[in-house]
Amino acid sequence: MALEPSRYLDKKTWKMTPAMIRARQPYFKKNMIALGLLLGITTGVYVYTFNLSHKDNDFIDVPIPPIDEKELAVLQKEFNDKKN
């Protein structure tokens, strides 16, 4: 059978036996430190990349052309028609 429990799992509840918990205990602290380090590095790279890519607004010096009232009314009508 593919899902037969090992001798370190309770056959009824599939929970770890006390022997398995004792066997894993020396590695728990190191694994949590490694997990924290891995998550910290990943988060740091993500935040650094996000801040680097959103630092400059490339279009800040591009002037926005003025729009007259007729064009604005046409655009608003088109928007409202698409919305409904």
Swiss-Prot record:
Superkingdom in the source lineage: Eukaryota
Membrane topology: Single-pass membrane protein
Mitochondrial matrix compartment segments: 1-30
Annotated GO biological process: mitochondrial cytochrome c oxidase assembly; negative regulation of mitochondrial translation
GO cellular component annotations of the record: mitochondrial inner membrane
Subcellular location: Mitochondrion inner membrane
Keywords, in A-Z order: Membrane, Mitochondrion, Mitochondrion inner membrane, Transmembrane, Transmembrane helix
Pfam families: Coa3_cc
InterPro entries: Coa3, Coa3_cc
Residues in the Mitochondrial intermembrane compartment per record: 51-84
Similarity-based family: Belongs to the COA3 family.
PANTHER family for this protein: CYTOCHROME C OXIDASE ASSEMBLY FACTOR 3 HOMOLOG, MITOCHONDRIAL, CYTOCHROME C OXIDASE ASSEMBLY FACTOR 3, MITOCHONDRIAL
Subunit structure: Component of 250-400 kDa complexes called cytochrome oxidase assembly intermediates or COA complexes.
Function: Required for assembly of cytochrome c oxidase (complex IV).
Name of the protein described by the UniProt record: Cytochrome c oxidase assembly factor 3, mitochondrial
